[in-house]
């Protein structure tokens, strides 16, 4: 039975995502593993539901939900990206602010607004929580924390001045720099 395969985490440049899908499909085919259909044309939406689909053979996931919410999922490998901030399988999050605030230190954002992609994101939420914890007062640091649904949307919220700071993973940032630099304008 042929099963599905998707790479939703960094699907910023459709042609590159399709090329990755086709290369992996070819490798699997050589080993007798059939993958159904063509590369998905759309974002799968709810990623946690997507990762739990019984017909899903191979996908990408953020490490935090992998270890906290997906016990039925098996790790088969880890991509090594060439983006600045990546070293082998390790990567970093970047704290991104508007250009007008680029001279500020993290402590200067006390009482300001943060935007995070999702509560189940290591790179967009938990890393920021860990960084501000020693700076918090009575368990609080930001005046508000909103969830945008994606790193790209978090950047839009910064551009629209709905938030003041966001943590963005370095792979997303590098791909946006290369393929959609307007998404980083003003930051």
Language-model region placement:
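Short, surface-exposed acidic
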Residues: 32-39, 138-142, 184-186
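A ligand-binding cleft/hinge motif common to bilobed small-molecule-binding domains
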Residues: 61-70, 159, 164-186
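Hydrophobic hinge/microswitch elements
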Residues: 148-155, 159-164
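N-terminal hydrophobic or amphipathic helices and topogenic motifs
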Residues: 1-74, 78-81, 87-90, 103
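Alpha-to-beta junction loops
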Residues: 51-58, 112-114, 159-168
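Short hydrophobic/aromatic-enriched beta-strand-loop microsegments
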Residues: 75-78, 141, 166, 185-187
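Conserved residues at the C-terminal ends of beta-strands
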Residues: 59-61, 117, 148, 169
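Bilobed "Venus flytrap"/periplasmic-binding protein-like clamshell domains
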Residues: 7-23, 88-148, 154
């Amino acid at each position: 039975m042929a099963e599905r395969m998707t790479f939703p985490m960094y699907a910023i440049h459709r042609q590159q995502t399709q090329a990755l899908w086709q290369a992996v499909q070819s490798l699997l085919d050589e080993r007798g593993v059939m993958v159904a259909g063509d590369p998905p044309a759309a974002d799968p939406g709810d990623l946690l539901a997507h990762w739990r689909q019984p017909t899903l053979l191979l996908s990408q996931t953020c490490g935090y939900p992998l270890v906290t919410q997906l016990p039925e999922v098996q790790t088969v490998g880890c991509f090594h990206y060439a983006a600045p901030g990546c070293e082998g399988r390790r990567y970093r999050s970047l704290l991104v602010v508007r250009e007008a605030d680029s001279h500020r230190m993290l402590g200067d954002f006390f009482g300001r607004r943060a935007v995070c992609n999702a509560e189940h994101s290591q790179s967009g939420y938990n890393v920021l929580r860990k960084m501000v914890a020693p700076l918090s007062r009575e368990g609080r640091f930001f005046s508000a924390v909103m969830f945008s649904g994606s790193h790209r949307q978090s950047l839009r919220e910064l551009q629209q001045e709905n938030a003041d700071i966001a943590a963005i993973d370095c792979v997303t940032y590098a791909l946006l720099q290369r393929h959609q630099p307007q998404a980083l304008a003003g930051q």
